[in-house]
Every structure is written in structure tokens, then in C-alpha cells.
Amino acid sequence: MSRVYNFAAGPAMMPEEALERAAAEMLSCRGAGMSVMEMSHRSAMYQEIFDRTVRLLRELMEIPDEYEVLLLQGGATGQFAAVPMNLLKTGADYVDSGNFAHGAFVEAQKYGNARVIASSREESYARVPDVDAGAIDPDADYVYITTNNTIYGTRFTRLPDCGKVPLVADMSSNILSEPYDVRDFGVIFAGAQKNIGPAGLTV
């Protein structure tokens, strides 16, 4: 069988070694006599798999201990609501740099005072808009960006200076493709399917 090379934005190709191991363990994961899909999420073996996954992600991204790592069901668009539902109290500033950033802003408006502080929407998102530090509300609950835009081929080459306002970043299309200092962010989230795993999981 010849493999098809998929250059779409996602779901992306997965390493053949990972697929072969998953296939080999589909009926019996690590000799357990059952598939990982059949395991209780409270079982010792599942906990071991979970802990190792989190440990490897911490190692690869150099995630400090003061940050939690969550493995969540569903795609990253679910976080468009989860972020404001958990963080938006008085107001949030959004950088409208593409389709997904705009969708996140529209969703946030349902939960409180969200405003766009920089946008390239009128230019069909041909570039990432410049973010003037003076435009950021120092009392905002957070500033929201999408670090990379696969649809338009644009990315943030320099993070906005948010002062003491937490920076929230959707890294779905470039997580683990370039180094970031996690301490520059209050929240990072990413759907797994573009860079680090199968569809249906968000970190």
C-alpha cells in the first residue's frame, strides 16, 4: 500500500511509526488485554499514559510547574467560548488577524465586553495587524491572539507587549513548530490535529 501525502492544514499526517504502534496495540494496549479506548479513565494504566503525555509536553515546551496542562475533549473552537466563560469579567482585547481570531472575538461578545484593538480584516487578513501597546486596556482581563494563520499564511513574528495583562494564544497551527517562552502567556491552547496528534483533542 502506498501512503498518501497530505499537505492540508489539518488533520495533518501522523508519523507512520505512531500509526503502526497504535494499530498493533488496538486490541491489547501494552498487554492489558483491552484497547486504550476501552480502559477506565481511572485505571492505573490509563493514568500512566496520561501522566507520560503531560510530562513529555512539559519537557518539549519547557512548561513551568506553575502552569497546568489540560487535555480536553473537542477541537480548539470550543475554547472560543471556554476562554471568556472562565476569564472575561470586565473586558477583553482581541487582535483580529484571521478567520479563527475573528470567530473567537464574535463568540466572546456573547459573554461580556470584548473589543478589537487591531485588525487586518479590511485587508482580507493579508497581514498580521500591528498592535499598539497603547491600545491595550491595562485593566483588560486578557489580550487574545492567534499566533499563526494557516488560511492566510501569516504569523506573529513578535508578540504584542501586553504589560501586565495576560496574553491568551490560540496556537493550533504552530504549537511545537517553533519555541515560545510559556511565561509570556497566561493561557495557551491548541487543537492537536494540525501538529501534535489526532483530531478531537485540545491541549
Where in the sequence are the language-model features?
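A glycine-/small-polar-enriched, mobile loop at the entrance of the PLP active site in fold-type I
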Residues: R3-V54
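General beta-strand structural signal in soluble alpha/beta enzymes
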Residues: N6-A8, V69-Q73, Y94-D96, V116-S119, ...
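Active-site phosphate-binding strand-loop segment of PLP-dependent enzymes
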Residues: G10, A108, S120-I175, V187
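Generic secondary-structure signature for well-ordered alpha-helical cores
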Residues: A24-G31, R55, E59-I63, K110-N113, ...
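Conserved N-terminal alpha-helix of the aminotransferase class I/II PLP-enzyme fold
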Residues: M34-Q79, N99, V106-E107
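PLP-dependent aminotransferase-like
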Residues: T77-V143
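Short, charged, surface-exposed secondary-structure boundary motifs
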Residues: G103-F105, S124-P129, L176-Y180, G197-L201
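Active-site PLP attachment segment
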Residues: F185-V203
